[in-house]
Amino acid sequence: MDAWKEITKTTENDGVSTCSLSSIAFDPYSELVWTGHKNGQIKSSFGPSLTSYTQFIGHEGPVHQVLPQERGVFSLSSKSLRLSNRKGTIRWRYQDSDCIDYRAMFYQSRNNPEVVIGGYHQKLTVVNAERGISIHKDKNVSDIFIMRRNRLLCCGSTNGEIILRDPNSFQPVNKVVAHTGTISDIDTSGNLLLSCGYSLRHGTYMLDPFVKVWDLRNLSSLVPIPFPAGPTIIRMHPKLSTTAVVCSCSGQFHIVDTGNPLDAKLMQIPLTSYLTGMDIASTGDAMVFTDVEDNIHLWSPLENPSFSDLKLPIQLPNTSTETVQLENNDPLNSIGLPYYKDELLSSWSKYLIFDVGKPILDSNLLIAKQISENSHPVPQEIKSFHRNQIIEVPWLNRKLISEGATPKFHSERQKDIMSGNDIEGSASYFEEIEDTISGPDSIPKFYQRPVIKYSKFGIEDFDFGFYNKTKYAGLETDITNSYCNSVLQLLSYVPSFSKAAISHSLGPCDLMECLLCELGFLFAMLKESTGRNCQATNFLRAFSNSSFAQSLGIVFDDYSDGTFPDSFVIQKFTKFMLTEISRIADYEDKKDGTSFPVSFLLKSFCIPEMQTYRCGICGITSQKIKSSLYIIDLHYPSQQLESILSFEWLFKMSLDRRVDLPPGWCEYCLAHQPFLLRSFIRSLPDCLFINTQVKHHEHWKLWARKNWLPKKLHLRRVNDTMQCVSQKISNLDKDQQSLSVYVLRGIIYEIRQNGEEPHFVSTIRVSDNTSSDNPDDNRWYIFNDFLVKEVTEEEALTVHGPWKIPIIVYYEKLDTKIPQWDEVSDYTLLYQPYSLNKNPPINKIQPLTTDEMLYPKMLVGIDSEFVALQQEETEVRSDGTKSTIKPSKLSLARVSVLRGEGPNKGLPFIDDYVATDDKVTDYLTEYSGIHPGDLDPDRSPYNVVPLKVAYKKLRLLVNAGCIFVGHGLQKDFRIINLLVPPEQVVDTVDLFFLSSRQRKLSLKFLAWYLLDEEIQLTEHDSIEDALTALKLYDCYDKLKSQGKLEETLDNIYEVGRRFKFRPPSVASMSLEDRNSYGDESVISNQTN
């Protein structure tokens, strides 16, 4: 408040008469200041410079009050009420022959907007604001000098009384005797009523040296505000509900808090006369004063203040445009373009050029062709070319990147590269495709649902990298309930959430279906992926099995019943996840040794809420209930949504809600009385999740406003509740340390495309430093499943059209500090057996001993077996070709890990069969070696463990830096949902592979050719396959050290081609077959 200063001073004096200004008011809907004059003129000035905008004659006599509203500008004189538009054109005029002298008016917007007027004629009149006719009159009322509207209509009179009237019936409810003389001014804010006026002292009416303050709830008098200079004008601050501006006629004014009247800031307007009027802009950024000499003084703490929050555009007069002189050397960018709404032709994509076909031939030429079969009609434009000239047809050689382009499969791209047919100009990344600009009806492709295509080689052949050239991972969609991807992506970039989940997943946890552990595993993959696509298979499987989630209706079974997730399902899922964390925290509290990461995580988003029930008659609060929220729902008023000025106001109302309840029993009144339920937030955590609750188009229109969603939220605690203030108001707050600043970090949107089910995307500000102003630390990305793309901040925050609906908003407290704790991995599972079996299982392993500590680059052999939960879905086209609609759904059934070095090399230390509650459609026994009953802990003779245990063992090996040796590990790790860094994978299918042959060799064939071993004779055994992979790796090292690797690879493919890459029995090979490749056996030639 100390920074207030005069920034503009203008005069309305015409040089003939003085004291012509009679009223002044800011326009709450546009950047205008309105003034009324004693000669009936009404003027408006634009902007901080107070440039003249409009001027017109409104009345025959003095203009007592000007009241700008959305419908226009109301002006009141002694005999008439007029409504004009902002250009000065009259809409209607109201006059009453019985009126003596109108003095005050007030606009109230109900179902039918009305203007209430009063004056010195003992009559209160209500005029319809649309038609300008009287709809209600009250006679025999006291004189009304000034009116203010709050919960009650406050009418000040010349006898010192303030009559409080019901705003609906306009009947007197109560009255306050404020002064013994006339009232000078009154104003209201919230439950406060302030007045200043005259009192009789020593036989003379003198200004009271203080401002009187009342509480309208019980009409009790509060501590008055001292003002020795004598108050004549009072205005309550429109943003600070307890702050008042008190002015004297000498030009002094105080800015004072009614709760602390002694702490006032005194300022002086440089006047040579007396002050006659003042007003405060609805933004609170400017004040305007008028004096007897018709000067207008504009005060503000800003150099360029704003008068209106809405800033509706004003219509400027038409001006003739000058002819633009353009010379050859003049730059084109010096010539401006006219305003346009539609897209310019120059910005159309070159791919919007279409072939319209050949020109229409003349009918006479067609008749001529019928007469002579040897003649052919030729268009006249072609006849104009000579025979040695070439007609250029641009579309023949044009190479387009189709707007609906999809990436080529890896196999197709590799084939094109090998054959030299790779098309020049084909897109390597999604961002290279020509795309549209976001608009009310145009949906760019990066918002549309990306679709996975399948080839005969399965999903591994799909090029996910086409949709993501960033270092941040996307999530795949071919999984049941993958609608959760947008929420999972947002949570992964909440630092406290990600760190606590990963730490929890590494430690001991007894819950076998722990969603926090699954989140930790997923977040670790997303963190380490460096842009590779990931999938939330294990998390979504555990989520789908949750009975609590099923009861909430947020688990879907491949949408088989025709229902699809919508925005409210996403909001329910988010609330479910935060509630689930609370449940896990309660479980940890009951155990010995509470897990600090979980308790810290709960505090980071848990919101304490208080609910009170107050009797509407006796006013006694009868019950207080404390509860916890995890996400805040926005609550919109049922009517007059257009009156919501900002997101901060809406959020403030949602933090402190009041609801009228039906009558209940009051213990103090001993009767059934109406109750008021109040729900308010006492404090806010570091992580703030907000449900937008956009339920219909009127709600959406608020979010479509420009700059509706603030990048920062400023909150402070007032008494017992949290309040949200705008940034401008927060800058005026004297106690900056009491403010909490929250930074916008992410938004989840629902994308609606015509004819398709909705899907969800998240826009996230990916940054490790929320307080940084460095642009590199404030980059926004859109996560649309496996499509990830950097976007501008404007693109991320703007709601372009009805197809883009905000669902969840996430704010993070500025400078949030996450405590450091040791992320200690629990390796107990690797050293101690774990089993679900009721009977002791067959022991095929020797667990690691304390002497066999894991270390980086330690070799381990691995192989996995899988069962099918869902068969492949295919379709046969009319040409006989078959395409995959959906691949088979596989689940981990067995995993074996062997020591790859040391004295116990080849000895397994993990051989787990994985229990599953899902229905197995095919055990794939021929390829997996799994039989019915092997995965049932009650019947299986083998060691059966939960999926979480098997997965965590592998995760621990990855974290320890072990190198996995196996055959076809890419597909195995994908189904297991385990991300292993490439440097920790040795895949024998790639070691013995020639890209020029375009065929990868089976483990069975390589073992026959290189090791002289026959494996997989009956069924697959993961221990045998893992051991074989270790031997092949040793063979590879030996061949490479001898310099025979390339020669051996060529021979392998030659032999494979002869035997169709199927190993025959060595004993059954004829002598001719053996000798055709040398004097010695085929195998011995390669191994010696």
Curated annotation (Swiss-Prot):
It comes from the Eukaryota. PROSITE patterns: USP_3. It catalyses: Exonucleolytic cleavage of poly(A) to 5'-AMP. SMART domains: EXOIII. A divalent metal cation binds at residues 863, 865, 972, 1025. Gene3D superfamilies: Cysteine proteinases, Ribonuclease H-like superfamily/Ribonuclease H, YVTN repeat-like/Quinoprotein amine dehydrogenase. It is found in: Cytoplasm. Residues 860-1033 form the Exonuclease domain. Positively regulated by the regulatory subunit ppk26/pan3. It is an enzyme of class 3 (hydrolase). SUPFAM superfamilies: Cysteine proteinases, Ribonuclease H-like, WD40 repeat-like. Residues 443-814 form the USP domain. Binds 2 metal cations per subunit in the catalytic exonuclease domain. The keyword Ubl conjugation does not apply. Pfam families: PAN2_N, RNase_T, UCH_1. One of its GO terms (cellular component) is PAN complex. Belongs to the peptidase C19 family. PAN2 subfamily. Forms a heterotrimer with an asymmetric homodimer of the regulatory subunit ppk26/pan3 to form the poly(A)-nuclease (PAN) deadenylation complex. HAMAP family: PAN2. Catalytic subunit of the poly(A)-nuclease (PAN) deadenylation complex, one of two cytoplasmic mRNA deadenylases involved in mRNA turnover. PAN specifically shortens poly(A) tails of RNA and the activity is stimulated by poly(A)-binding protein pab1. PAN deadenylation is followed by rapid degradation of the shortened mRNA tails by the CCR4-NOT complex. Deadenylated mRNAs are then degraded by two alternative mechanisms, namely exosome-mediated 3'-5' exonucleolytic degradation, or deadenylation-dependent mRNA decaping and subsequent 5'-3' exonucleolytic degradation by xrn1. This is PAN2-PAN3 deadenylation complex catalytic subunit pan2.
